[in-house]
Structure formats: C-alpha cells, structure tokens
C-alpha cells in the first residue's frame, strides 16, 4: 500500500585480536599386542569455547572434530607412487572412519568468556581435531611402552603397531 516503514540496520564488528579456545582431551585405548589392532574405548574432551551460543551445535562440532582426529591418528594416509601420483584417490583406497569404529564421546564444556567480543564466545570447531590426534596417538604409545615401543609412524594402523612391537621385542 506504500505506507509501510522500512527498517534497515548495518553494523560491522572488527575484533581487536583473535580469540583462543582452550581444552584437553583424554583417550583410552586397548591394543591387541598379537595383532596390533587398536580399539578406542573412551574419549573425553573438555573444551573452553567461552559462552556457547548453541550448545547442541557446539557438541556436534566437537564430535565431528574428534572423529576426524581419531581417523587421522588411526587410519587416514595419502599414499603416492614413485611418480607422485596418489594411490589413495578414492573411497575404495582411502579409509574413512565411521561411527561403528568410535565410542560415544564424552564432552565437557567450560565457559570462560573472552573479552574480545560482546558475546564472550570463542571458536569451537577445531578443538576436536587438534586434541583428538595426539590424545589417541599417545594413548597407543602409552599402552605399548612397557614393551619398549617409543614411537610409531602415523597413522597407527594395526600393521604399524604390530611392527613397532615386534621391533621392540627383537
């Protein structure tokens, strides 16, 4: 009808510096020393992403990140031939982790608001991947360290774990 009032707003926010989330992850694994097969039994993640705007989405971000980290620690690897051509270029050759290989993750959120923005929020998506990889890797090393194993190349496939155990025993 032409008598309406238009309401428009515009705002730019530029943070004076980036925010930094903090956290820690603990993985519990079982390693079959006869086969090298590793099973992730438990994974606990405590993350401080400041004020969570949507805790359900934050949980999903952390769960997805942990799954990526576990996959990188246990199975993901790009392999090239002698000419530099990828040999793991599709899902038939490149292993992808699924929920069948993963336990239910235990997520704990801390909330230390940042002063950098008015919401007090920090990033949350990367924390699962960043904490997931070393927690799983070092849980495996810890599980076989009594056998003399000090290092295993990633990914820590059953073959690599078994080879490291065999080398330490000889």
Where are these regions (language model features)?
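C-terminal catalytic domains of large/alpha subunits in multi-subunit enzymes
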Residues: 1-170
